[in-house]
Design a protein with these regions (language model features):
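Residue-level marker for the onset of beta-strands and adjacent loop->beta junctions
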Residues: 16, 74, 84-86
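Short beta-strand and strand-turn-strand segments in soluble, beta-rich domains
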Residues: 68-74
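Extracellular disulfide-bonded cysteine-rich modules/repeats
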Residues: 81-92
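Exposed extracellular interaction/assembly regions and N-terminal maturation sites
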Residues: 1-67, 90-104
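Beta-strand-rich interaction surfaces with strong enrichment in secreted/lumenal proteins
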Residues: 75-79
Length: 104
């Protein structure tokens, strides 16, 4: 059996538009705009939805450990830059961190 993520989708986040519409995506390449925006994720499709976020080489952005506002339960706030990655799973209520690689 092969586990495969959907084709990568490139997204830019800004301080004015920090929300990422996850939809049925499972692999996002995200880049900031120089303001280090704090990302907000929309809900997952169903329980168990996996989401891999890869930091595009370029300007950083922050994943915030805040279930109420950002729908993310992380080990702490994570600055994504370089080629960092973050793997999340949708619990039905929030995105929960599985792993994080700081690749810079």
């Amino acid at each position: 059996m092969l586990l495969s993520l959907a084709p990568r989708k490139s997204i830019q986040v800004t301080k004015a538009k920090p929300t990422i519409i996850v939809g049925d995506n499972s692999y996002l390449s995200v880049r900031g705009d120089g303001t280090n925006p704090k990302v907000i994720l929309t809900k997952g499709r169903e329980n168990g939805h996996l989401l891999l976020i890869e930091s595009a080489l370029g300007l950083p952005f922050t994943m915030v450990d805040n279930v109420a506002t950002h729908r993310t339960e992380l080990s702490g706030n994570i600055t994504m830059k370089g080629a960092s990655t973050l793997l999340l799973i949708w619990s039905g209520l929030r995105w929960v961190q599985i792993s994080h690689s700081k690749n810079f």
